[in-house]
């Protein structure tokens, strides 16, 4: 019985660890979503700004800078989307581990009662 309690306690600790990790991943995903949205807004802002700048203003250098900034922001959006996909995958894996652990714990308790 003591082994069952010890194993049960270890299972609970592992479950809590996984639960916290899952919540951290959810927070990271939310943070990345905000970063994606912010950078998409910056891309739109730069697109609008680019429409107002004309060659008559002799700002070819400014256009080049804006284009570089736009490319940089688009790259960041892509990077955050990739990172979000990785975090979501890890979150799903943790959720499956938690589900399996919960099932195993229930079976362990059932065996202990028998």
Swiss-Prot record:
InterPro entries: DUF496. Its main location: cytoplasm. Pfam families: DUF496. Transmembrane segments: none annotated. It comes from the Bacteria. It is found in: Cytoplasm. Keywords: Coiled coil, Cytoplasm. GO terms for cellular component: cytosol. Residues 70-111 form a coiled coil. Pole-localizer protein involved in the regulation of several cellular processes. Belongs to the pole-localizer TmaR family. This is Pole-localizer protein TmaR. It comes from Mannheimia succiniciproducens (strain KCTC 0769BP / MBEL55E).
